[in-house]
Swiss-Prot record:
Its EC number is 2.6.1.81. The keyword Transferase applies. Catalyzes the transamination of N(2)-succinylornithine and alpha-ketoglutarate into N(2)-succinylglutamate semialdehyde and glutamate. Can also act as an acetylornithine aminotransferase. It catalyses: N(2)-succinyl-L-ornithine + 2-oxoglutarate = N-succinyl-L-glutamate 5-semialdehyde + L-glutamate. InterPro entries: Ac/SucOrn_transaminase_bac, AcOrn/SuccOrn_fam, Aminotrans_3, Aminotrans_3_PPA_site, Class-III_PLP-dep_AT, PyrdxlP-dep_Trfase, PyrdxlP-dep_Trfase_major, PyrdxlP-dep_Trfase_small. Its cofactor is pyridoxal 5'-phosphate. NCBIfam families: arg_catab_astC, argD, PRK01278.1, PRK05093.1, PRK12381.1. It comes from the Bacteria. GO terms for molecular function: identical protein binding; pyridoxal phosphate binding; succinylornithine transaminase activity. The lineage of its organism: Bacteria, Pseudomonadati, Pseudomonadota, Gammaproteobacteria, Enterobacterales. The modification N6-(pyridoxal phosphate)lysine is found at K252. This is Succinylornithine transaminase. GO terms for biological process: alpha-amino acid biosynthetic process; arginine catabolic process to glutamate; arginine catabolic process to succinate; ornithine catabolic process.
């Protein structure tokens, strides 16, 4: 007999680095979840842009079960067929010629930053070690990546931090230009700042970074952990902008809910990462890569990408209609199915309250700071689920605006 557990047990047994919702999901199907009490939720959070095909997708379950019945793990002393097939699919679909598999976005970004430093040290000299990142970015929770993130709240308790990392203002080419020089080995940027407020980069900004990196022989790293694998209506957001990075990191949606990350680059840059310079125990394991291979098969199609663009339009239309009614948002922005609603001044700081009320009404949403409500639903969310979920979201907005009876 299994142990009966409640939300209160989290506070008793777990390290308190999270404050989970008061309910515990126990079952999912598509874009719907049910909690321990059987209450249904429309999921517009998507595991923070992870569940690209929703919950318990039949094809992903089949891929996982098929590999689970073969073998699970061998370690990096051996390769495996699912990893090799996934690497080839990523190479065929992108600019990349080499792939490094890991377990998360943070690990992918850690690998990217290490590669950039080593390439510069090997080809130019140890003085070329500077990294330029951007304020309010998010690249992971390792000491290196959290230092690159440019959010002191996440890094200030862990000093001394890795040196030679400077932060420019996002979407401000003049600010970046003032920091990028001959000592810069890499520039790391999100095509859309997710945690920083769902802020898409301008094309001119990314083009300018590409030109600056070329001028100073620095590597341009695109962190596509949140924007990648179809999220923006292209397989990767760099395709939307027409700006090709030297290194791309991907994770989240790549596994559709199964942990996996990857760093993509060219043969020239990858050549400095010789045996022993970097590694991972679980990265590229056959379970993760079998699932990710199926995710790519489903998402990397014109039909799926066109569907994302159509669903983007449906979300925007309904959110604009909702905003006419409530007037709570000063801006609705984003690309594809990564969307952010910026709260008006009178509701500043209340994004979390809206998310909590939304859950009571039966819809799960995210926040991106205190002033932005974020949506990152499954890429195959249905029109009916969009309509139902946003009707429930409207109840939460009404509750916050009027102070009426709680939802649910």
């Amino acid at each position: 007999m299994s142990l009966s557990v409640t939300r209160e047990n989290f506070d008793e047994w777990m390290v308190p680095v999270y404050v989970p919702a008061p309910f515990i999901p126990v079952r999912g199907e598509g874009s719907r979840l049910w909690d321990q009490q059987g209450k249904e939720y429309i999921d517009f959070a998507g595991g923070i842009a992870v569940n690209a095909l929703g919950h318990a997708h039949p094809a992903l379950r089949e891929a996982l079960n098929e590999q689970a019945n073969r073998f699970w793990h061998t370690g990096n002393g051996y390769t495996n067929e699912p990893a090799l097939r996934l690497a080839k699919k990523l190479i065929d679909a992108t600019f990349a010629e080499r792939v490094f598999f890991c377990n998360s976005g943070a690990e992918a970004n850690e690998a990217a930053l290490k590669l950039a430093r080593k390439y510069a040290h090997d080809r130019v000299g140890n003085h070329k070690s500077g990294i330029v990142a951007f304020k309010n970015a998010f690249h992971g929770r390792t000491l290196f990546t959290v230092s690159a993130g440019g959010q002191p709240t996440y890094s200030q308790d862990f000093a001394p931090l890795p040196p030679d990392i400077r932060h420019a203002a996002y979407n401000d080419l003049n600010s970046a230009s003032a920091l990028i020089d001959d000592n810069t080995c890499a520039v790391i940027v999100e095509p859309v700042q997710g945690e920083g407020g769902v802020i898409p980069a301008t094309k001119a900004f990314l083009q300018g970074l590409r030109e600056l990196c070329d001028r100073y022989q620095a590597l341009l790293i695109f962190d596509e952990v949140q924007t990648g694998v179809g999220r923006t209506g292209e397989l990767y957001a760099y395709m939307h902008y027409g700006v090709t990075p030297d290194i791309l990191t991907t994770a989240k949606a790549l596994g559709g809910g199964f942990p996996i990350g990857a760093m993509l680059t060219t043969q020239n840059y990858a050549s400095v990462m010789t045996p022993g310079t970097h590694g991972t125990t679980y990265g590229g394991n056959p379970l993760a890569t079998a699932v990710a291979g199926k995710v790519l098969d489903i998402i990397n199609t014109p039909e799926m990408q066109n569907g994302v663009r159509q669903r983007h339009d449906a979300f925007i239309e309904r959110l604009n209609t909702l905003n006419v009614r409530f007037g709570m948002f000063s801006e609705i922005r984003g690309l594809g199915l990564l969307l952010g609603c910026v709260l008006q001044t009178e509701f500043a700081g209340k994004a979390k309250l809206i998310a909590q009320e939304a859950a009571k009404a039966g819809v799960m949403v995210l926040i991106a700071g205190g002033d932005v409500v974020r949506f990152a639903p499954a890429l195959n969310v249905s029109d009916e689920e969009i309509a139902t979920g946003l009707d429930r979201f409207a109840l939460a907005c009404e509750r916050l605006q009027t102070g009426g009876a709680p939802c649910g």
